[in-house]
């Protein structure tokens, strides 16, 4: 029988451990602080930011939110980041993507103090990840790594196909999977929009991680029996519902479930782990910057 992996349950377990570490820091006079910066009028981005701030508040992390009009200059955003870099009450900084077209994304990522880069996207932190000495692992790949471990899925010696090569998920996910140690030691193939015969690659995989942002691009015919399927995608598609749309992943859940040994749903799969690992990184940042030792889960 196929196991439907409950991301909410695993995320809650991790968050509970992070909350205990937050209590330890607070008892030593250190209140972890996360600053979110939104330079967009996009409703979905506003929702994501509010979810992250609410999660922080629930475990005692102080939230600081900065809203910048999408019409403002890049310098307005850079000035805000500079202020947050210098603020000792702020241990983590998250600029919600995407930013407007007139703002260079790379410059935004490089502007954040790497010690406060809790997304793990600053070039220094990317380099540390590739070198096997990560300071902050990117939240979604780290969450998937935790999810696989909690579900009892061993990656060592397994063939893993990552579908998608984004800087946010695909590339760091592949880097984590090939590294030495628990959650790594996998033989990893990265597929993308130019991959020939994607189905041939996915059928030969023990684990498929779908992160291409294409609705239901992977179905049961592209999987072998017993595969573990991790669906990172979250896509709005038109539907005959009250809202006029429904959320689907990059995997056709119903057909894939017939083949998979374990599979994540959308929503309720990877998403809760992404937020849990943001809290994890924020508390780790507070520990590193304050010198107060903690034992994260």
Curated annotation (Swiss-Prot):
UniProt name for this protein: Bifunctional protein FolD 2
Organism, scientific name: Haloarcula marismortui (strain ATCC 43049 / DSM 3752 / JCM 8966 / VKM B-1809)
Catalytic activity: (6R)-5,10-methylene-5,6,7,8-tetrahydrofolate + NADP(+) = (6R)-5,10-methenyltetrahydrofolate + NADPH; (6R)-5,10-methenyltetrahydrofolate + H2O = (6R)-10-formyltetrahydrofolate + H(+)
NADP keyword on record: yes
GO cellular component, one term: cytosol
Listed pathway(s): One-carbon metabolism; tetrahydrofolate interconversion
Alphabetical list of Pfam families matching this protein: THF_DHG_CYH, THF_DHG_CYH_C
UniProt keywords, alphabetically: Amino-acid biosynthesis, Histidine biosynthesis, Hydrolase, Methionine biosynthesis, Multifunctional enzyme, NADP, One-carbon metabolism, Oxidoreductase, Plasmid, Purine biosynthesis
InterPro entries assigned: Aminoacid_DH-like_N_sf, NAD(P)-bd_dom_sf, THF_DH/CycHdrlase, THF_DH/CycHdrlase_cat_dom, THF_DH/CycHdrlase_NAD-bd_dom
Known role: Catalyzes the oxidation of 5,10-methylenetetrahydrofolate to 5,10-methenyltetrahydrofolate and then the hydrolysis of 5,10-methenyltetrahydrofolate to 10-formyltetrahydrofolate.
